[in-house]
């Protein structure tokens, strides 16, 4: 229900309003970035290590990024998890890094957004976070 309500709220906007809303939240505001390791590590060397590990994980599973997004960009992480074929793969354990980065990043993002949690984008993030947590707790991996 929460997922559909968020989609409906976003769909009620014109495409131009959707773009302005998204850009205002995530592209023009450091407080609400979708780069998941930024919150914990900002621009430290440790963040560089995480970005390199994520990139290696993508490559290990055959994903080559064609855009200039950093490896910790939430939509990229979610796309990797959604379309990856991990079931029965001995390297399945390696995708835990993606879950950890998303868990850490969305936790801080939603803490920063406490005053704006009624925004449909943050409602979507809450659903994503809860779904991924359920996957981790039950041992279910995208396939």
Residues of each region from the PLM?
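Charged, alpha-helix-forming regions
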Residues: 1-143
